[in-house]
Amino acid sequence: MASVRNLWRYKKLYSFPYPIGGANVSASPQSVPVELTKYAQEDFFNRLVVRVFGNIIIAGSGSGTATGRDNPEGLLIQAQLQTSPQVTGVTPVNRLSARGLLYENMITRGYLLKASTVPDTAGTVAVDWHYIFNFSRSRTRKRVEYTFAIQKFTSALLTLTFGSREQLFSGGTNTWDVSGLSVEIYADSAFAVQADQIHSHELFEQNYPILSTQSDFPIDTLPSGYLYTDMLFLAEDNNVLSSAVIQNFDLEGGGRVWLASGDNNAAIVQEDFTQELLETGQTVTGIYAPVSILRNGMFTQAIDALTAPITVKLSVTGPGLGHVFNVRLVGRRMVPGAVQKAAPKTPAPVKKTA
C-alpha cells in the first residue's frame, strides 16, 4: 500500500551569517537576496519566519540616544518579496519595515510578539527574535486560498536589508559587533492543496510625513484595480507610537462611505475596532485598524476599488517644536483568483427519457 504524502511541513529553507561584520559605531545597510524557488518547489506557504539569533558584543562607555525604532527588530530596515511572473502588478511583500511586519503580525495573532530591548551599554547580549510573513489569513473563510503557491512562479526573490547600531541609537561612541548573529528562514507549508482558487495579494507599506494640522490629509497613493482587505495605520512621534497624531479617518469611494469625515472617530477605531482584534491587555497606543478582513473572514466585504479608486483622508494634528510626526500605512490588497482561477464546473449530463 502506497503511503500518503505529508500534507504539511515546517522546514528551514536557508540560513546565512548576519551581513555586517566588525565593531562599528554605525555601518552601511547590507542587503541579502534569497531565491526561494531554489529551496521550495511544491509548497503553498502559509507563512515565512525569519529568525535572527546569536550574540551582540557592545564595547565602550559612550551610550547613544534611542532612535525610537523597535529594538532590536528595527535592525531590519526593509523586506521585499518579488515574483516572476508578476501577477496583476502585485509584489507579495512590498517594502515592509520591521515595524510594519511586527504590528501586522500583532493584528494577525492577536498579541504582540516582541523581543527584549538591547541596551547601548558594554557587554555581550544574547538575542533571538523573529519576523513573520503571513500569507494564509487566519480567521478567514477558505484561508488556503491566500497561501503563496510557489510553483506558480519561476522566481520568488526575498530581499532582506539589515543595519546595525545606527538603526537603534544615535550619537554616542559605543561600538556594536553584530557578526555573531545568524539568520534563518523557515517555511510553514501545505502540500497537495485542493483550492478552488488562489488569490493574488500584496502586503505593502507606505509612509506619510505629517507637517501641519490638516482636516483632510490625503492618502492618495492607493491605485484602483484591487480589493483593499486590510489597512493598519501606525502613528509616530519621533519614531515612537503615539495617539496624538490622528483624530479621524474618512474612507469613501464610488458613492460609498465606510468611515465618514467629521466624526472624530480615531479614538473609537482604536478602542473598539482595533481592540476587538486583539487579546485582552494589548497596548494600542498609536495603532489603528479601521479595515480588517479578520472581522468577517470574507474578501467580499473588503473595500472595493476594482473599478473605481477610493479616497482616504485623515484629520491630523501637526507636530510641535522638536517633534517629527509620521503615519505609516501597512495594508493588504488583492485580486481574487488571479494566481489560480477556479475551474469551470462541468454541467451534469442530461438524462434521456425513453
Where are the language model's segments positioned?
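Beta-strand-centric surfaces of beta-sandwich/beta-rich domains
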Residues: M1-A354
